[in-house]
């Protein structure tokens, strides 16, 4: 006869056998909760029973913190647990790792499995996401025609960005036919390039009601879409696989509409600021050119000789008037263009309009540069003509040693024109008085 076992030895033996059985280390059990207690430490203690048996169960605080449902006596739950023995009492006990209400358990397990599979494919990664367009012209909506989500999205779009066209694809958002309809709507939007960005969503609901957005065909269609997609499924606390795969996740349908649209009032404010800056720029440019023309008009080179001043002053005046006229025309043209763009704001994307403004600014700047080049050429020619006139002016000739004679205010061109009276000899730096004296041989000498 073998030696009898101590009670503790037997309990330890049973404990080891249970813990060495891999099947019993992760088993799913369904039953009704009774004797439920939540300890101050966060641990949960309860009994799991059915009509024939019952077992004690414990769920430690770390695992209990992940339970999203309200557990209470009488609740029917599905648990994932390991089986062991509580040595002090020798009782077999369930050590619970996960727990959910029965009825959603299978769906939740499927959700977790699909989420892990899709995440492993890299579909959640940021580099897989498409950027949202800054100024969409067409916005697609895929949702139920009867739900509040459509009203919330459409109302927000019309308020914030009324110039965008709305392309609506009505679908079921729950039930067996929901997923195929959602897939077809996404594919249709892509095939026809029907919109620049797409909102897919519905209002809140249970996991069963939101399940269409956890099905693989819908998830795949979202991932393969060439059009950026904003997911707006349920409320802020609801998450579906579609939310993780979509390019952007919005907490609510209203938030989705705000994400895909700029604020029209802010855009108008920015446009007005650009208009003011453009007007200020051209006004400053015209003022600088006018000052330059004034400096040229009052320069020494244009004052002497007077004949040249008269000719060139007229040309400069015309050039100044032409520059002013062109400047005013440019400003009026740009102001009118900006006004026209504001009026066409409902039809043209802001980004394209700003780009066209930039191109118009470049063209105008080149035109003003050409005007500046013409003025500079005219100024160079003016200086050349002044130099040529100076080279033949009397002052320049006298600097080379020549003089001229005046008598009684008249210019004397021949010695025969001189009388016996005094006359004036003009040098470049002054004049002297002289008198004629005739020699006996008939020659005339100036004294």
Swiss-Prot record:
Keyword annotations of the record: Cytoplasm, Exonuclease, Hydrolase, Nuclease
Annotated localization: Cytoplasm
Pfam family, one: tRNA_anti_2
GO molecular function, one term: exodeoxyribonuclease VII activity
A GO cellular component annotation in the UniProt record: cytoplasm
Annotated EC: 3.1.11.6
Chemical reaction(s) catalysed: Exonucleolytic cleavage in either 5'- to 3'- or 3'- to 5'-direction to yield nucleoside 5'-phosphates
Family: Belongs to the XseA family.
Self-association and partners: Heterooligomer composed of large and small subunits.
PANTHER family found in the cross-reference section: EXODEOXYRIBONUCLEASE 7 LARGE SUBUNIT (PTHR30008:SF0)
Purpose: Bidirectionally degrades single-stranded DNA into large acid-insoluble oligonucleotides, which are then degraded further into small acid-soluble oligonucleotides.
Protein name: Exodeoxyribonuclease 7 large subunit
């Amino acid at each position: 006869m073998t030696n009898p076992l101590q009670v503790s030895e037997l309990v330890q033996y049973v404990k080891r056998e249970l813990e060495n059985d891999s099947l019993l280390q992760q088993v799913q059990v369904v039953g009704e909760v009774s004797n439920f207690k939540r300890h101050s430490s966060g641990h949960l203690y309860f009994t799991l029973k059915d009509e024939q048996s019952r077992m004690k169960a414990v769920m430690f605080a770390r695992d209990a913190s992940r339970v999203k449902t309200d557990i209470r006596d009488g609740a029917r739950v599905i648990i994932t647990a390991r089986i062991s023995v509580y040595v002090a009492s020798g009782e077999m006990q369930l050590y619970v790792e996960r727990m959910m209400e029965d009825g959603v358990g299978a769906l939740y397990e499927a959700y977790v499995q699909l989420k892990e599979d899709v995440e492993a494919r890299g579909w959640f990664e940021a580099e897989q996401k498409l950027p949202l367009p800054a100024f969409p012209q067409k916005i697609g909506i895929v949702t139920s025609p009867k739900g509040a989500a459509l009203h919330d999205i459409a109302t927000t779009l019309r308020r914030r960005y009324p110039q965008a066209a709305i392309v609506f694809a009505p679908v079921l958002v729950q039930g067996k036919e929901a997923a195929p309809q959602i897939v077809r709507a996404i594919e249709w939007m892509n095939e026809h390039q029907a919109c620049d960005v797409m909102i897919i969503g519905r209002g809140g609901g249970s996991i069963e009601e939101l399940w269409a957005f956890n099905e693989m065909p819908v998830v795949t269609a979202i991932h393969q879409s060439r059009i950026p997609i904003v997911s707006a499924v349920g409320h802020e606390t609801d998450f579906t696989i579609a939310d993780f795969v979509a390019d952007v996740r919005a907490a609510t349908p209203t938030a989705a509409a705000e994400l895909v649209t700029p604020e029209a009032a802010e855009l108008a404010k920015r446009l007005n600021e650009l208009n003011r800056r453009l007007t200020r720029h051209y006004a400053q440019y015209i003022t600088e050119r006018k000052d330059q023309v004034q400096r040229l008009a009052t320069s020494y080179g244009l004052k002497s000789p007077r004949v040249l001043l008269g000719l060139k002053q007229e040309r400069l005046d015309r050039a100044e008037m032409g520059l002013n006229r062109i400047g005013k025309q440019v400003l009026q043209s740009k102001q009118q263009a900006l006004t026209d763009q504001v009026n066409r704001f409902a039809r043209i994307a802001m980004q394209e309009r700003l780009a066209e403004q930039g191109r118009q600014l470049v063209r105008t700047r080149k035109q003003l540069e050409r005007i500046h080049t013409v003025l500079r050429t005219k100024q160079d020619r003016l200086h050349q003509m002044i130099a040529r006139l100076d080279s033949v002016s009397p002052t320049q000739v006298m600097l080379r040693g020549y003089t001229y004679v005046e008598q009684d205010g008249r210019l004397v061109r021949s010695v025969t024109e001189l009388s016996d009276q005094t006359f004036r000899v003009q040098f470049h730096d002054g004049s002297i008085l002289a008198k004629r004296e005739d020699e006996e041989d008939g020659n005339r000498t100036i004294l």
